[in-house]
Structure formats: C-alpha cells, structure tokens
Amino acid sequence: MRIILLGAPGAGKGTQAQFISSTFSIPQISTGDMLRAAINEGTPLGLEAKKVMDAGKLVSDEIILGLVKERLSKSDCKNGCLFDGFPRTIAQADALKNDCIQIDHVIDIEVDDEEIIKRMSGRRVHPASGRTYHVLFNPPAKEGVDDITGDPLVQREDDCEETVRKRLDIYHKETAPLIEYYREYKKNGGPNALKFSTIKGTGSVESIKEKILNIFHN
C-alpha cells in the first residue's frame, strides 16, 4: 500500500504520518532523507544531486524520481510506503504516473489558513532543551519563560506569521493543485483507481487518527 499525504505546512501531516507509518509498518519516505542518504552513500544519483546543490541550484525532478525508484526497490518498501513531502508539484505527480508507480491512497488533511497561522505563530521554544510551548494551547506556567529553567522562550523564524503566510502562498500555488489532480485521477482511473479522501485536520490528534483509520477500513 502506497500512500501520499497532502496538506499545508502546519496541518499536522508529521504527526499523522508517524501514526500511519507505525500502524501499517511501512516506511515514511522523505525526499530530504533520500537526498541525504544518497549523498552520504556516494551513489551516482547522490553525487549528481550534490553537484547540483553545491552549485546552489534546485535538484531536478528527474533526479528526485530516480531516488524515489531506488528507495522503492529496497526490502522495507515491499508492503508499501508513505510519501512525505512528495510529490510537491503536478510535474512530479505526472512523472510518478508516467513511470507506472502505483499509488493506492491519497489523503488530504484540510485546515484553514487562519487556523494554521494561529497554530504555528503561537509556538514558542526553549532552545537549549527543545521543549515546545504554545501561547494558546500549551502555555508555560509563566508567560515567555521555560517551566524548568526559567530561560526566555523564543519564536523560531519559521513560525513567524510573515514566514508562515509565505509558506502557505507557496503551498497554494505549487502543491494545492495536486488535490484536484488526484481527485480527477480517482474519477478517471477505472477499477484500480487510487482512493482519494479529504479529512478535516481540526480537533484532537486522536480524533484525526480515527478519521484516517476509517478511510482504510471502509
């Protein structure tokens, strides 16, 4: 079973990806992890990717797809995998389809932009320990300081509202079109078509896990 998880940054994909991976005993495949592994192992594709990255350029879809195919050939993928952050664009989705890489489920976790901004911009971190708080949902005992050490908490640059809005803009331009792409793919795919589902990513983590399990049990 091969699964693609879609959703904007901050929609909760990371938490649910870990849940799906452990529940179905399938690896979570990240293009970033694949790139790092290929570079560290010195594979031909890894060396090619390193050359491109060292030149400050983006790694091509051709290289990424080559890495995906290499990864899928490994024994831990024999029962399937969960794609994390791939595909990001229609071109990458087309490349998957053209290479006859079968996808079984696409799950879109839907959360409104303003809810995502509230979630992400409210995060505060204790840099030394990594302890994470949220000004609304998990506030420290004393505003602005770590519960254990009393050190000041910080807001990571990635969590600043302006940065979050920019990331959401990129998502809506580049990745959100995949939702309609896979919805159409499901309609036109015949008896072996993939299953496409949209779930609301609001509510408790456990309630969202339950929604995901229902997709696979129906």
UniProtKB/Swiss-Prot annotation:
Keywords from the named record: ATP-binding, Cytoplasm, Kinase, Nucleotide biosynthesis, Nucleotide-binding, Transferase
Cell location: Cytoplasm
Residues holding ATP: G10, A11, G12, K13, G14, T15, R123, T132, Y133, G203
GO molecular function: adenylate kinase activity; ATP binding
Domain of life assignment: Bacteria
Single GO biological process annotation from the record: AMP salvage
Catalysed reactions listed for this entry: AMP + ATP = 2 ADP
A GO CC term attached to the entry: cytoplasm
Family: Belongs to the adenylate kinase family.
Database matches in HAMAP family: Adenylate_kinase_Adk (MF_00235)
Full protein name: Adenylate kinase
Gene name, Swiss-Prot/TrEMBL: adk
